[in-house]
């Protein structure tokens, strides 16, 4: 009869579940850490750009809010990074956001927007050609411009040239489906807000209002789709 020595019972060490997961899936966990660090870098860069843009707008006498600009810049960068990863579309969305932010503040200040903003959006649209398709972009931009030029002619100056230039450039970037949806969404938000605001402030409905901020909201919303 062979007597085997009795080995002492040793309880396994208590390991933090997070550490255990990291050890078991170290490759995935490491990639996640790297991704988070990259997102933080993108958000930080966006925050710095937002700060510089805000200073530039202040020097030009624009209506602006530093806190809003910095928070919106950071949130937009994180949101786009979560949606598209660290792809070219994330950076396209970030720069589109800054262009629309600049256009919105300019519109709120004196109802004008420099032509270089819409031209910059058109240049940024080149990134969309492989995924959206140039035909869709061209149709969307043309339809948007035609509709809004007609509205401009019928409104007697109530619908500004900057409005249709910015929105048509955005529709061109997004393609006809998403672009026109963003335009309609932005216009709808703008009309509802203006009706409520004019009612509260007892403001004349015939007075003009800044439309580009609402168009920007609609366009950035559908950019995530």
Segments from the language model and where they lie:
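A membrane-topology feature that recognizes alpha-helical transmembrane segments
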Residues: 1-225
């Amino acid at each position: 009869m062979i007597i085997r020595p009795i080995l002492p019972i040793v309880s396994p060490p208590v390991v933090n579940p997070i550490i255990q997961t990291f050890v078991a899936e170290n490759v995935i966990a490491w990639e996640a850490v790297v991704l988070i660090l990259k997102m933080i870098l993108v958000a930080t860069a966006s925050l710095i750009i937002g700060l510089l843009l805000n200073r530039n707008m202040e020097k030009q006498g624009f209506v602006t809010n530093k806190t809003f600009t910095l928070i919106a810049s950071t949130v937009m960068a994180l949101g786009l990074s979560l949606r598209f990863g660290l792809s070219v579309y994330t950076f396209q969305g970030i720069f589109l956001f800054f262009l629309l932010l600049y256009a919105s503040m300019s519109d709120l200040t004196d109802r004008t927007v420099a032509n270089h903003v819409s031209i910059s959006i058109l240049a940024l649209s080149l990134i969309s050609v492989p995924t959206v398709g140039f035909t869709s972009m061209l149709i969307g931009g043309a339809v948007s411009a035609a509709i809004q030029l007609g509205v401009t002619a019928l409104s007697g100056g109530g619908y500004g040239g900057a409005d249709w230039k910015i929105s048509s450039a955005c529709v061109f970037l997004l393609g006809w489906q998403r672009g026109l949806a963003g335009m309609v969404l932005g216009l709808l938000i703008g009309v509802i807000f203006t009706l409520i605001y004019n009612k509260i402030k007892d403001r004349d409905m015939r007075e003009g209002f800044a439309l580009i901020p609402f168009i920007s909201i609609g366009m950035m919303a559908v950019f995530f789709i």
